[in-house]
C-alpha cells in the first residue's frame, strides 16, 4: 500500500492521515515512512491507538464531516471502512470530505467493500484462537436486503476465570464499481483501479488534480 502512495503521489510532502484508524495497527508501520496522523469516531478505538502509537496525533471525527486545519499528502481508508456509508449520497460526501483534506497532488487510497454482484448472502466465516489461556471463536453470517449488507457476529470467549458469549451486528453499503468511480471523480480525483487490491476486494487510488474538490 505504501508503495502505491509513493508511486502515485505528486505532492512533495510526507504527511498522511488514516481514516478511520481504528486501534492504530496500520499506523505502527506507516509512521516509519510518513508523518502520520489518525482519525476515528470511536473513543475506545482511539484510546488503544494512542497507547499503541505514542507521539502520533489522533483526532476524533466522522469521515462524513470531519474538519481538520491542515491538508495531507496522503489519506488512507482501508479494510473496507468506506462500506460503513450506506447510501450513495453518504459515499460521495465521505469521499469528497477526504478529498477536501488533500493537498494538490495528494493521493487518496480507498479499499472498497464487496460489490452487490460479488456479495453472497448466507455466507459463513469463522475465526478461531486456541491458546493455553484463551479460547475464542468468532462466527459471522452475511445477509443482504437491497443495497445494505449485514454481518451478524457471534463470539464465544473463554479464559481460566470466565466464559463469555456476545453478539454484534455490522451493516455495510453495497456499491458498484461505477458508483465508486463516479464518487472519486466527482471529488476532483484522477482514479487508478487495482482489481486485486490488498485482499482481493480491489483498491482505488485517486490523485488530487487541484485544490478544488
Where are these regions (language model features)?
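Residues lining the SAM
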Residues: 78-80
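A short glycine-rich, Lys/Arg-flanked "PGG" loop and its adjoining helix->strand segment in the class I
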Residues: 92-104
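Conserved class I S-adenosyl-L-methionine
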Residues: 12-20
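SAM-dependent methyltransferase
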Residues: 109-181
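Class I SAM-dependent methyltransferase SAM/SAH-binding core
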Residues: 17, 24-65
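C-terminal lobe and adjacent flexible extensions of AdoMet/dcAdoMet transferase-like proteins
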Residues: 177-213
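Conserved alpha-helix/loop element of class I SAM-dependent methyltransferases that forms part
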Residues: 1-12
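A short acidic, Gly/Pro-enriched loop at the edge of an enzyme's catalytic core
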Residues: 67-74
